[in-house]
């Protein structure tokens, strides 16, 4: 069986020794960028390799980019090969944040043409609650070859977002918390607020009280109401830096609403240009008076 959105803890546990399965630990903390790797070295799912959001799943920040620019795809493909991934592998990614960081790797692999990738439902916390095995032993990896192509239709630039909103040809959904979206709090970026015309769907809305994804039917109803009358193919997801937005994109895929896109630069790129409009903060309020 091939998994392309979610995989359960039970299914992963049954395939830990499968020769064509590869597991990646994507735990990360924006507040302490070394914390994820430290946690990985202490314990992780057997066979898992650590994929660092900053070092592996992003490229260096530039003056014109957001906080997590997309990685160099050729370099990432080479790393995947070094990590034992080939084009036949079933890949499983996990974190301890409800899929907020693992979703980035899920989306990247799909954009590179590898659809056999799934997020571990419930993440590492659910895995441990079920008493499933963990280890501190680093896996021994035999390098392989991973061929990829880049489907640049899967994300939009800032200029495309401006054009799409002006022409009302896209529906933009922001995965940040409501406080950040409304501009009431901004603990990370230097400017608070939102892109005018965007709607808010905090990623936590996709999970139940146990940290598992809602059912496909529940997600379908909620997203259908949110995006109407736009079709899924006209929906674009954003967040602070193009990472947690992938959670909403994943949720739509689970719901059977495929084809939505990512604004890769997201809010932290948008505010680099002071001429771009923003809403919900003091600067916008002054400009309207």
Where are these regions (language model features)?
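Cytosolic catalytic domains that perform sulfur/thiol-centered chemistry
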Residues: 1-289
